[in-house]
């Protein structure tokens, strides 16, 4: 736990001269990583499930707004399934998190992102599975007519590939470990649709239950991206690793040490604080998406003969 910008975020976005030397020393490994990732995707067995599958992904490791994007577009349709890996869950294999809004498992079993989706998407079913093809088959079994696949670009499915592109890219366009990309930056050209922040969508934030002295506590990737949206009443920022669980005793200690009047958390972090007795303020994030983007997604979905606006 630390309250300054995490090392990896500095390394990938604002590297020092010494870090730049390390980046170029590791570059041969990045080329190997890039070749393996691209080879695996292009040679993977092709699957066609005869159902519209919208993959919401990114080329950059870590958060880029995939969950808020799905939260924004999924409610526009009925008979929807959301399929995710279920990061940092304490379960393995395929787990049905919710069926049409009825939540079946705990946050720990589902993972924070999947549980957040289940809480907010009352018309959708949420499934987590390391093997996405099994998740899609389960969605079909549940009667879903549309699938939103979280982070599915690397899978060779017959799907609509949508890639989110951040407003601020990493310092170098390299793959891991020299950069933050999981595939070559040229892979953007292979997507059906590339959605760029502040061009095709904008982040809109509001604070629920604000107080005079808020202590920001978050466990998301690249947490400094929240800075532009934080209220002036934030007295300190405490960052945990992405998806990390919160230690409630540590939070209580920091709360009193900083004379805070509430913890400020994101909606994603809130699902992990159900047992927290401290006052909570919530930084709500939603996306305003260009209607042209929504129209392109609609056109793909309605290209399937049994999907019509009357039915969905």
From Swiss-Prot:
It is an enzyme of class 2 (transferase). GO terms for molecular function: ATP binding; tetraacyldisaccharide 4'-kinase activity. It catalyses: a lipid A disaccharide + ATP = a lipid IVA + ADP + H(+). ATP binds at residues 60-67. Its EC number is 2.7.1.130. Keywords: ATP-binding, Kinase, Lipid A biosynthesis, Lipid biosynthesis, Lipid metabolism, Nucleotide-binding, Transferase. GO terms for cellular component: plasma membrane. Pathway: Glycolipid biosynthesis; lipid IV(A) biosynthesis; lipid IV(A) from (3R)-3-hydroxytetradecanoyl-[acyl-carrier-protein] and UDP-N-acetyl-alpha-D-glucosamine: step 6/6. PANTHER family: TETRAACYLDISACCHARIDE 4'-KINASE (PTHR42724), TETRAACYLDISACCHARIDE 4'-KINASE, MITOCHONDRIAL-RELATED (PTHR42724:SF1). HAMAP family: LpxK. This is Tetraacyldisaccharide 4'-kinase. It comes from Helicobacter acinonychis (strain Sheeba). The lineage of its organism: Bacteria, Pseudomonadati, Campylobacterota, Epsilonproteobacteria, Campylobacterales. The gene is lpxK.
């Amino acid at each position: 736990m630390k309250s300054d910008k995490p090392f990896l975020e500095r390394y990938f976005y604002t590297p020092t001269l010494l870090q730049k030397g390390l980046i170029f020393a590791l570059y041969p490994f990045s080329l190997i990583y890039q070749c393996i990732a691209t080879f695996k995707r292009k040679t993977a067995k092709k699957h066609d499930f005869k159902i519209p599958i919208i993959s919401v992904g990114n080329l950059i490791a870590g958060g880029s707004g995939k969950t808020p994007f799905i939260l924004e577009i999924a409610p526009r349709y009925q008979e929807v399934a959301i399929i995710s890996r279920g990061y940092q869950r304490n379960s393995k294999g395929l787990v049905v998190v919710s069926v049409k809004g009825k939540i079946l498992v705990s946050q720990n079993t589902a993972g924070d992102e999947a549980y957040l989706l289940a809480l907010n998407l009352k018309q959708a079913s949420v499934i987590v599975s390391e093997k996405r093809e099994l998740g899609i088959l389960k969605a079909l079994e549940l009667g879903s007519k549309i699938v939103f696949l979280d982070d599915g670009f690397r899978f060779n499915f017959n799907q609509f590939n949508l890639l989110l592109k951040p407003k601020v890219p990493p310092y170098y366009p390299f793959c891991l470990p020299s950069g933050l990309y999981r595939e070559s930056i040229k892979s953007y050209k292979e997507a059906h649709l590339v959605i760029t922040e502040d061009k095709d969508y904008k982040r809109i934030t509001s604070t629920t239950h604000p107080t005079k002295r808020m202590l920001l506590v978050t466990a998301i990737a690249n947490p400094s991206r929240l800075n532009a949206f934080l209220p002036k009443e934030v007295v300190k920022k405490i960052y945990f690793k992405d998806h990390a669980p919160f230690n409630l005793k540590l939070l209580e200690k920091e709360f009193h040490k900083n004379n805070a009047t509430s913890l400020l958390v994101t909606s994603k972090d809130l699902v992990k604080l159900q047992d927290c007795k401290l006052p909570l303020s919530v930084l709500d994030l939603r996306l305003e998406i260009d209607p042209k983007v929504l129209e392109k997604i609609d056109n793909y979905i309605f290209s399937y003969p049994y999907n019509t606006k009357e039915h969905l």
